[in-house]
Each structure stands twice: as structure tokens, then as C-alpha cells.
């Protein structure tokens, strides 16, 4: 008998077949640089910087930006941001710069130029008669790359969030060492015709390059990161959520994974952890792998590890974390099952801790404590008297740990307890739920059961 087949009748005729469904055909690509070549983009002919500045500023005021021209200008303007490398900087086997080297963002990528001239039109109606200063160049660069951050803010229910961000960015780039170039609300108005610029490959690479540079190099103009910081760990929300989760519950990655009682975690954990990437290397290309074009379909995104992502944020919801309540549920990754496991794990770690004495008056007291521990004599609670028997589970080692949690789930038939449901409803009902968020899911799923 073939375990993959089902048998049924059609018009009294027995049919045996193997059900086939649509599966994910995308190949997850790890962002390793194997040929020791820096990320590369191709742009038009290098412009005259002063002419390019006047054209880019004019087009911003006229809300008629040309992405090819602006990318060409952003690449050429990298020369204004020279800094000193504080130590040898390597990534994926490549030497980016040596200690004390003078470098610019241009040092991080390879930019090829063609002979194609840019448009460099003066669409704003007013032509500058003088050449721009260095501060004016850096201010315009800051405004242009900020279009990346604004274009990453999506959704209909953001309220005034995007407008407030745009206004704050404008304030930064009209304050020293920058200078005011545009009128109030110009950035938000301009963004509306550039709402999809985060999908333009060259613009994305340039934004990531500027962010990688300023995250490493102390610089007068480092505030430019206000517009590019979203390129760091882009399409990496699954791995970022997992990292935050293990810090939140104060466990190692190995200890945390022991609590993941579901078969669908197996492939996701393998995918997320086996890539042998520079996840722990400071200032690596890995941090900006998506914006620098080093990976097509990220193995670290929320969709790539959807069950893991759902579980982590259901635990976060149980603990009342706003970020988790606002996050978007991955609907195709068993959210109902993950909410059950999330309730048990939330209950396991919420309002409890593992404590021990770590500081002592002198070495003699330390030695006495260690000797007592060796003989299994608990002196850690000596100053607190006895433990109430009603709270015994909170202090009993046998009641904590993955085995204990798994046993509780099995004893309850894989269903949430009433106390778990009440907690979920409590945190979600007091929160203004965004569409498709975890808060909305919990409200719709459990509010009638509380």
C-alpha cells in the first residue's frame, strides 16, 4: 500500500491517486560572496557634480525625479564622505580597507559607468547661478536616500506615521552640519511619486552602501542613516525575531529550540541556521545582503520561516509586547496551532525567572555558598524565609523546562487553558489592532471564548 495515495470511487469506479498541490518553487539563496567580488551596479556616465546637484534639487522641487539621474548623482557624491577606517575591515574573505585607510562609500561597491549621458533637466523652473557647497551636496544626498525609508513604509493604516517621519527627516537635514534646501513637506510630496523606489535595484544598492558605510565609520554626516537604516537586516525579520526572542526569554538558541514542538519547525530551523553566513561578524556585507543584491529570495525572512515567526510573536503577544501585537500574521503557516504553543510558552516565561546569588561580601562567603551548592543545600532563599507551598511550581526545577511544558500541552489535549485565553484576550482587546496583525487574530479567534 502506498502511504502517499488515497482511494475513492468515481461513478462506481475505484480511483487511486497521489494528491499534488502547489508548492513553493522559489529557491532560497544564501547571501555568500564566493568570487571575492564586491557588490556591483552599472550606471550612466559620471556627471558633473555641480550640474547634477542643480538638476536633482530642481526635480525634487518640481516633484519630477528621474531615478537614473538621481542614482548617478548619489554614486558620484560619495566623494564628499571620506572617513578613516578605525581597524582592518574584512567581509567574506575580502579586504575592504586597512586600519587608518581613508575610505568613502565608494570603497564598498564596484560601480561601472557607461557612456550614456543623463538627462540633467532643470525642471524646477529656477536655475542656481552659483555652485553648491559641500554641505548642500550632503544635504541633498540625505534627502534623496531618505526616499528609500519612506517607500518602505506600507499599509493603509499607518495614520500620520509616514508624514511624521518625513517631517522629522526634513528637520534633520536643515540643521547643522546640513543646510535647508527644500520647503516644509517637500519630502512627503516628492515621496508620493517615488513610492516604489525601494524596488529599484540600483537605488536600493546605493541606499544600502551609504548605510553600511555610516554604520562603520564615525563621520560628521552620519545622520544620513536616518533615511537608510531600514536597509540593515532587510528581509531578515525571521532571524531578527528569533534573535530577539532568545534574548527576551534569556536562553541560548539551542535551549530555546528545544521548546519548538511542531514538525514544521524542522525545515525552517535548518534553513535559517545552516547557511554558514557572517551573522556574528560586525559590519559584514551580510547585514545589508538584501539591499546590496546578494540574495534573491531570503532564507531569513518572515515568510521563509513563517511558523517560527508566528510562534515567536504569539509569545510576544502573551507578554504584552507592542511590536508583536502590531506584526503581521503569516496566514499560511498554521497560526491557530502556533497560538496554542505560544500560549504555553508565554505562560512558561511570563512573570517568572531563574535566579541565583552571583555577588558576595567577600571570598569566604562565596566559598561557603559554593560548598552549600555542591551539597544541594539551597541557601539562595535564606534571606526570604520559606516558599509558600501554593507557589511550589514556580520554584521547582521539575516544573520548568521543555519536558514539563510538553507534558502540560499533552495533558490538555493540545488545547489552550482558559487562563491562556484570558491572557491573550486581555492584551489584544486593549490594543488598537491593525489589519492582519497578531492583535486582530487573537481578538477574532479567542474573544468569544474568554
Swiss-Prot record:
Keywords, ordered alphabetically: Capsid protein, Helical capsid protein, Host cytoplasm, Phosphoprotein, Ribonucleoprotein, RNA-binding, Superantigen, Viral nucleoprotein, Virion
InterPro entries: Rhabdo_ncapsid (IPR000448), Rhabdovirus_ncapsid_C (IPR023331), Rhabdovirus_ncapsid_N (IPR023330), Rhabdovirus_nucleoprotein-like (IPR035961)
UniProt GO MF annotations: RNA binding
Keyword Iron: no
GO cellular component terms listed in the entry, alphabetical order: helical viral capsid; host cell cytoplasm; ribonucleoprotein complex; viral nucleocapsid
Domain of life: Viruses
Keyword Membrane part of the UniProt annotation: no
Cell compartments where the protein resides: Virion; Host cytoplasm
Post-translational modification: Phosphorylated by host CK2. Unphosphorylated protein N seems to have a better affinity for leader viral promoter encapsidation. Phosphorylation of protein N in ribonucleocapsid may stabilize the interaction with protein P, thereby playing an important role in viral transcription/replication.
Main subcellular location: virion
Chain positions with Phosphoserine modification: 389
Record's miscellaneous remark: Displays a superantigen activity in human and mouse, activating mostly V-beta-8 subtypes of T-cell receptor.
UniProt family annotation: Belongs to the lyssavirus nucleocapsid protein family.
Subunit structure: Homomultimerizes to form the nucleocapsid. Binds to viral genomic RNA. In nucleocapsid, binds protein P and thereby positions the polymerase on the template. Protein P acts as a chaperone on free protein N to prevent it from aggregation before encapsidating genomic RNA.
Known function: Encapsidates the genome in a ratio of one protein N per nine ribonucleotides, protecting it from nucleases. If expressed without protein P it binds non-specifically RNA and therefore can bind it's own mRNA. Interaction with protein P abolishes any non-specific RNA binding, and prevents phosphorylation. The soluble N-P complex encapsidates specifically the genomic RNA, with protein N protecting the genome like a pearl necklace. The encapsidated genomic RNA is termed the nucleocapsid (NC) and serves as template for viral transcription and replication.
Protein name per its UniProtKB record: Nucleoprotein
Species per Swiss-Prot/TrEMBL record: Rabies virus (strain China/DRV) (RABV)
Amino acid at each position: 500500500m502506498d502511504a502517499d495515495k488515497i482511494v475513492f470511487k468515481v461513478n462506481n469506479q475505484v480511483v487511486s491517486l497521489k494528491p499534488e498541490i502547489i508548492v513553493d518553487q522559489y529557491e532560497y539563496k544564501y547571501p555568500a560572496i564566493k568570487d571575492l567580488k564586491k557588490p556591483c551596479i552599472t550606471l550612466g556616465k559620471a556627471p558633473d557634480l555641480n550640474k547634477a546637484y542643480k538638476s536633482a534639487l530642481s526635480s525634487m522641487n518640481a516633484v519630477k525625479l528621474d531615478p537614473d539621474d538621481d542614482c548617478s548623482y548619489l554614486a558620484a557624491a560619495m566623494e564628499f564622505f571620506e572617513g578613516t577606517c578605525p581597524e582592518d575591515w574584512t567581509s567574506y574573505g575580502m579586504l575592504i580597507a586597512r586600519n587608518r585607510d581613508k575610505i568613502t562609500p565608494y570603497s564598498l561597491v564596484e560601480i561601472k559607468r557607461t557612456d550614456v549621458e543623463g538627462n540633467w533637466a532643470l525642471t524646477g523652473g529656477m536655475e542656481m547661478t552659483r555652485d553648491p557647497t559641500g554641505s548642500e551636496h550632503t544635504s541633498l544626498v540625505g534627502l534623496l536616500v531618505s526616499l528609500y525609508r519612506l517607500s518602505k513604509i506600507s499599509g493603509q493604516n499607518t495614520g500620520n506615521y509616514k508624514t511624521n517621519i518625513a517631517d522629522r527627516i526634513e528637520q534633520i537635514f536643515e540643521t547643522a552640519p546640513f543646510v535647508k534646501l527644500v520647503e516644509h513637506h517637500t519630502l512627503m510630496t516628492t515621496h508620493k511619486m517615488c513610492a516604489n523606489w525601494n524596488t529599484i535595484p540600483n537605488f536600493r544598492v546605493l541606499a544600502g552602501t551609504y548605510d553600511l558605510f555610516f554604520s562603520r565609520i564615525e563621520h560628521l554626516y552620519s545622520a544620513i542613516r536616518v533615511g537608510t537604516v531600514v536597509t540593515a537586516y532587510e528581509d531578515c525579520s525571521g532571524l531578527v525575531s528569533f534573535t530577539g526572542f532568545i534574548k527576551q526569554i534569556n536562553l541560548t538558541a539551542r535551549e530555546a529550540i528545544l521548546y519548538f514542538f511542531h514538525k514544521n519547525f524542522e525545515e525552517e530551523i535548518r534553513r535559517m541556521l545552516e547557511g554558514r553566513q557572517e551573522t556574528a561578524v560586525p559590519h559584514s556585507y551580510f547585514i545589508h545582503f538584501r539591499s546590496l543584491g546578494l540574495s534573491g529570495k531570503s532564507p531569513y525572512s518572515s515568510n521563509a520561516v513563517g511558523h517560527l515567526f508566528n510562534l515567536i510573536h504569539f509569545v510576544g503577544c502573551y507578554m504584552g509586547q507592542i511590536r508583536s501585537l502590531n506584526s503581521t500574521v503569516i496566514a499560511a503557516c498554521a497560526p491557530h496551532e502556533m497560538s496554542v504553543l505560544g500560549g504555553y510558552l508565554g505562560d512558561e516565561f511570563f512573570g517568572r525567572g531563574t535566579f541565583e546569588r552571583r555577588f558576595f561580601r567577600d571570598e569566604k562567603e562565596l566559598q561557603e555558598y559554593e560548598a552549600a551548592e555542591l551539597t544541594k543545600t539551597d541557601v539562595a532563599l535564606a534571606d526570604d524565609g520559606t516558599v509558600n507551598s501554593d507557589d511550589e511550581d514556580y520554584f521547582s526545577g521539575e516544573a520548568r523546562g521543555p519536558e514539563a511544558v510538553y507534558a502540560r500541552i499533552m495533558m490538555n489535549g493540545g488545547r489552550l487553558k482558559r487562563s491562556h485565553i484570558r491572557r491573550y484576550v486581555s492584551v489584544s482587546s486593549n490594543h488598537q489592532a491593525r489589519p492582519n496583525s497578531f492583535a486582530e487574530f487573537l481578538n477574532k479567534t479567542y474573544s468569544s471564548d474568554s
